[in-house]
């Protein structure tokens, strides 16, 4: 499975790549928020101060922290930064990649950059990938470039 194929998976397929306890929490939060993936990501990031020490754990800051994760996902998927070059190379040469494997590689690498455990950040990564919709990686990366150009 390529990264582009990964981003095209259904929300249920992406959520099923998480550990069972994470799937249960994410699905419950999605019901409570009427399927708002970004709101669930924010709730996850503000879940508890002990889990989010590097982020601060404050609810009103969760959007800022979500944007940090989005920036890292952009670096990973778009390849516009050498930070994740080794991980992308491994994914390109690995022939049998499941969505669980891809989530594991992404969450470990991004979690390492942000100073949090990959297992903590994995649901946020999945929710943010789902929020991309069915947009292919190239289109999403181009959209992110345009947004950054307009805001700078």
Where are these regions (language model features)?
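Membrane-inserting effector segments that mediate pore formation, membrane fusion
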Residues: 84-142
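Charged/polar, solvent-exposed surface patches and flexible loops
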Residues: 8, 16, 27-31, 43, ...
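Mature extracellular/secreted ectodomains of secretory-pathway proteins
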Residues: 46-102
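Cytosolic/matrix-facing juxtamembrane and C-terminal tails of multi-pass cellular membrane proteins
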Residues: 142-152
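Alpha-helical interaction segments
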Residues: 33-34, 55, 66, 130
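N-terminal leader/propeptide segments of preproteins
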Residues: 1-53
């Amino acid at each position: 499975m390529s990264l582009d194929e990964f981003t095209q998976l259904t929300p249920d397929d992406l959520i099923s790549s998480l550990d069972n306890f994470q799937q249960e929490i994410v699905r419950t939060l999605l019901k409570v928020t009427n399927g708002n993936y970004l709101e669930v990501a924010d709730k996850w990031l503000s879940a508890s101060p002990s889990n989010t020490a590097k982020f601060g754990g404050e609810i009103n800051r969760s959007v800022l922290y979500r944007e940090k994760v989005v920036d890292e996902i952009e670096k990973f998927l778009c390849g516009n930064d050498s930070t994740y070059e080794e991980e992308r190379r491994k994914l390109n040469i690995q022939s049998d990649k499941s969505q669980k494997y891809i989530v594991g590689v992404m969450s470990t690498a991004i979690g390492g950059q942000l100073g949090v455990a990959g297992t903590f950040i994995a649901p946020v990564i999945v929710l943010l990938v789902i929020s991309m919709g069915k947009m292919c990686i190239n289109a999403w990366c181009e959209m992110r470039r345009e947004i950054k150009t307009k805001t700078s």
